[in-house]
Amino acid sequence: MHPYSHILSPIQVGNLLLPTRLTSSAGAHYSQELPNRALNGASVIYISHIMLKTSLLASVANPNGVDGPGGPRMSDKERKEFDAILTCLEKIHNLGAYAITMPMGNMPRRPGEHGGPGGPGGPGGPDGPGGPPMDNRAPGAGPESEGGGDMRYDPNDPEKQLYAEREGVMGHDIGWISEEGIWDYINSTVENAVNLKLFGFDMLSVHCAYHNNIADEFWSTKCNHRTDAWGGSRKNRARLILTLFEKLRTALGPDYPLEIILTAEGIGHKYEDTLWLIEQLGSNVDVVHIRTDYKDTQHPIGYTVTREMPSPNLEITRRLKHDLMARGIHALVQVSAGFCNPDLMEKTLADGDADLIAIHRFWHADPEFLKKIQEGRGEDVVPCVKCNRCGKCPVNPAEVFDDATRARIIQPVTRKKKVAVVGGGPGGMYAAILLADRGHQVALYEQKEKLGGQLCHADMVDFKWPMADYIAWLERQLRKRENVTLHLGTRATPELLTQEQYDDAIIAIGPRFRSLNIPGLTEENSCHVLEAYERADTLPEHVAVIGGSETGTEIGIYLAKKGRKVNVMTRQGMLCPETPHSHYVIMIMDYFKSIPTFSYTTFVQQY
């Protein structure tokens, strides 16, 4: 039996027969990487942010044609986007996969808000219909009171975002939206969905999670304080979602696949509410995609506190799937968040905890991971380090290149060389693997007895365990290649390299450390952060850490957990200012606040 038989088993979703149980989740635009995922086995590809006008999407069904007599007109920008989406769709379909996106409706706008009545671009507003020309104010500028509602979340205001993420309030009070605005949103979403189907999309998904979209704001008691037929009771709060899906099913047909994205248990609704909602949706939904709320360790930054629960979403999805089955509800359940291990994916499907698994980051780390799974080579899949920098993936930097450039990176060579790689950190290890795969004879030198370089210390704080997994993977890959020789505990001197008569050498020894001009820093009781990791057990009881970025904060946490009384000193006003706010709140602030021997001090003196 194939070790990943459940991942590779087909499944019927509406009128589609998916070849595997893995999908490519939302997060990428219509770029080259999406067809590459289809090439490597993804059954459904999400294409995000389809912002073209409904009339332009519908133009494919217009007998006059796009830009033809009686047809819709396109700007150069719209034409470029139109062609890019169409090309992406054609490639996905030609490779045997299906395409899915999210229909977009007319979002109600507050008075004074950008696009709203009296606001920039809105009716009667600057640059809007019947309004004056735009002045020098930024879009949406003006007193907060003009907009009404709960404005605590602002992605451009770090303090507001920190507060919102801390309190779990990522939406707005929707009491100001008129009945007309609600129906306009529903009807325009359905119209857009019909045109997306005509355009060539095989499946549609409606996002009803996270409190930052109108559907979840109506569903949540945190945002919905209305007293009319759209608020109050659970039935009234669900009215928008239920009405929308009923109209979508009628417009798209009984077999067209529809997905709803929900949080099983979140701010403003309980787990039992989610079960009830899915039951009410009935046959109007084919797939229930479960995501976590904002207060978790996966979204939008990915380190998890424990290796035992690599996906914080799995436990509640498992419970939901089995509870739905017990009630006789046979909607397919899709789970996402943190699935970067083929064995975990297989077990999740084999145990019946989910029917589908949506993946985003893993496609960046190893675009060929499903191909390796099909070949039974799960141990060769490149592990994702969950750094949340998918566009510049550190474990797969070649992904940013176009196909032609990527193809040239690993090519068989016409002349095999004897190559030395100096440095056993991640850069040197990866270089040795690439050289070996191209056919060269490689010798890797590392002056320490252990491979990994500076990443050997990166997982000292236990929530960064993915770093250790990546180093272990690199070492396994090196040892599997017969044309790689490891020289650990060996300093690669010029004399040694000359004596061995190497054709070429790659130097991967990392940067030099920069020391701050701080009085006392050269005394015996001072040391660099890497030295502090290595001699942590011999450091005195009281330790001061100079520098409060991620490195300084993590060594402080590490030493405090070892019993030292640590004070981290920073001149930046807060710890880890360079990290995404959710990562700071969940993995840094919550973490160090639970350690009584950890503290920090901010100061303004610069040296």
How does the language model describe each region?
Residues Q334, A443, T485-G489, C527, ...:
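General small-molecule cofactor/ligand-binding pocket signal
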